[in-house]
């Protein structure tokens, strides 16, 4: 601390005092105010009232109290990113969640996987510096489609599957300079926030900008009083490559962090994020674009335009969009040039909406089930009810978004009334969808009527058949790709786990794979510990899966106790016969004593 040209080292004096009192304050640390008061008392005694120590502590206490905790268990930095994922693998994942949009899923899976695999290839072969800035064209993507067709949903799924940070912004909220709305570079800073401050991880993230058609500078669009072309120009550098400063002059937190960094190191450090590997995906409905495409096709006299005109469908025209159409729509050529990949989403019809609701991975139905489960009520839907809900949603002309309001309108009364009753289950049938108020009234008047239970069991059985069919299809795909076989018992176990709300189908298979690794680990551990080899047969694995998924038995603890309990019996057989390899069956899992007793009796019966 500088005082009139001299340097007073408080730390050395405080260290001696701290050592002397270590026994008294071992478990008690002074808070900020106490520390500030003690230091000021010391300075006052030493130099009088001429010197005061002011400590500005604007950081929330909670932030200071945070430890490493569970964060140590999470993959750090880029290690969590799946750089080597193949397009077909990602497309298969999307097929389980996203209905229709075959072409969009194919293009997105291919180009996004290529983007990250190219990054991996360049870095593994140390080519980043060699070709830095030379011929680097990112697979930035433009998605065209109406509201409610799954544009945002599909990008969120991809980001989650790949393990990359993801942020979404609205193009209408940004301006060229930041005077109105936000600065486009704020999206890059938000990406660092989503990456928990990990700049390296953020540099491989995905930035998704919706409503991009609203910044087209064409006269037929009415928007906020800002320069739309200016916003386009502001996006040019981030979409290609630039360095974005994390600290901005008007941000007090950034200023505070810079001061603290300078206080600690005596150096001014500028934290920047390079956008070279950040993937930009933009989307919009682009109403009116089909007219531009139609004029171009007609002027060119393309042979298939007659067929398109007969369909009178804007989405047929959008399939033929070109860069020149987007430029005429109001985008600058430099902006369009940074979006080399164009994807057109299909509109959703009634059957598509029905398939969305029917899909066990549907967030709409699963979310509503969780809402009722929070009150201890088990909610099930009949297939006919899902069809009626889809028909109602289609009338709203808002795509999949209409499904949410359709379900809410039907079930709102039940969600309000049933938590105050003893009702523990509800079947959403065609009858309920047609007359929700009447059905609710009859249920409240006679909740113990066997009719309600019969309807619930019917819905549950329908759902079980649908889920089992989808789990079996997924299992067949595993067999085809990996050679792994699944018994009917294991398929039924996974289906029941999904039905009970334990996980969606992909997650259930991930957990099964993890469980199988745990089983093999304990087999190896038993050999290392006791010099005896044990192997669980397929029936035993099925039974362990049932215990883990349906009976909620912790598998690690269960397997450790099971094998330790089996060791004396197996050791006895080994000592008598020399046998050192054993096959454990489902009986060993359920009744290890009976299993070992039978093995010992079989041994003595031979002699």
Report each predicted region and the residues it spans:
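Non-catalytic accessory segments flanking P-loop/AAA+ NTPase cores
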Residues: 2-607
């Amino acid at each position: 601390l500088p005082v009139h040209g001299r340097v007073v080292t408080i730390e050395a004096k405080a260290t001696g005092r701290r050592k002397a009192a270590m026994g008294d304050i071992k478990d008690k640390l002074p808070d900020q105010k106490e520390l500030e008061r003690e230091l000021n008392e010391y300075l006052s005694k030493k130099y009088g009232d001429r010197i005061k120590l002011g400590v500005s502590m604007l950081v929330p206490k909670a932030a200071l109290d945070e430890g490493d905790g569970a964060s140590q268990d999470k993959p750090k930095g880029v290690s969590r990113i799946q750089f080597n994922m193949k397009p077909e693998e990602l497309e298969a994942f999307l097929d389980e969640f996203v209905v229709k949009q075959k072409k969009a899923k194919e293009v997105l899976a291919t180009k996004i996987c290529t983007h990250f695999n190219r990054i991996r290839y360049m870095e593994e072969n140390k080519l980043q510096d060699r070709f830095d800035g030379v011929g680097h064209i990112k697979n930035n993507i433009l998605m065209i489609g109406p509201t409610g067709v799954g544009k945002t949903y599909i990008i969120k799924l991809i980001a989650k599957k790949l393990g990359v940070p993801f942020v979404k912004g609205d193009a209408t909220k940004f301006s060229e300079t930041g005077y109105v709305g936000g600065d486009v570079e704020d999206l890059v800073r938000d990406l660092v926030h989503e990456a928990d401050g990990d700049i390296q991880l953020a540099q491989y993230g995905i930035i998704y900008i919706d409503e991009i058609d609203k910044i087209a500078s064409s006269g037929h669009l009415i928007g906020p009083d800002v320069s739309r072309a200016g916003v386009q120009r502001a996006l040019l550098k981030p979409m290609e490559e630039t360095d974005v400063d994390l600290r901005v002059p008007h941000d007090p937190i950034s200023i505070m962090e810079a001061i603290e960094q300078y206080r600690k190191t005596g150096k001014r450090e500028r934290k920047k994020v390079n956008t070279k590997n950040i993937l930009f995906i933009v989307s919009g409905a682009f109403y009116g674009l089909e007219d531009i495409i139609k004029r171009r096709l007609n002027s060119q006299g393309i042979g298939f335009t007659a067929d398109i005109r007969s369909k009178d469908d804007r989405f047929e025209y959008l399939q033929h969009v070109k860069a020149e159409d987007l430029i005429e729509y109001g985008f600058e050529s430099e902006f369009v040039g940074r979006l080399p990949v164009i994807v057109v989403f299909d509109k959703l019809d009634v059957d598509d909406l029905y398939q969305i609701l029917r899909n066990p991975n549907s967030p709409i139905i699963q979310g509503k089930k969780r809402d009722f489960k929070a009150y201890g009520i088990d909610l099930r839907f009949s297939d006919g009810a899902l069809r009626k809900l889809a028909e109602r949603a289609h009338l709203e002309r808002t795509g999949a978004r209409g499904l949410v309001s359709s379900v809410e309108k039907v079930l709102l009364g039940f969600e309000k009334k049933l938590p105050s009753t003893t009702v523990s289950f509800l079947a959403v049938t065609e009858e309920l969808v047609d007359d929700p108020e009447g059905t609710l009234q009859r249920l409240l008047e006679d909740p113990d009527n066997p009719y309600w239970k019969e309807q619930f069991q019917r819905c549950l059985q329908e759902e079980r058949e649908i889920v089992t069919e989808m789990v079996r299809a997924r299992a067949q795909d595993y067999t085809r790709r990996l050679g792994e076989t699944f018994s009917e018992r294991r398929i039924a176990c996974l289906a029941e786990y999904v039905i009970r709300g334990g996980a969606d189908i992909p997650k259930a298979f991930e957990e099964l794979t993890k469980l199988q690794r745990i089983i093999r680990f304990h087999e190896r551990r038993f050999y290392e510990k006791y010099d005896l080899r044990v192997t669980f047969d397929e029936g035993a694995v099925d039974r362990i899966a049932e215990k883990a998924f349906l009976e909620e038995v912790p598998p690690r603890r269960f397997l450790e106790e099971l094998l330790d309990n089996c060791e004396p019996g197996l050791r006895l057989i080994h000592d008598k016969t020399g046998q050192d390899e054993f096959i454990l069956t489902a009986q060993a899992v359920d009744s290890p004593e009976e299993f070992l007793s039978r093995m010992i009796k079989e041994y003595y019966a031979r002699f």
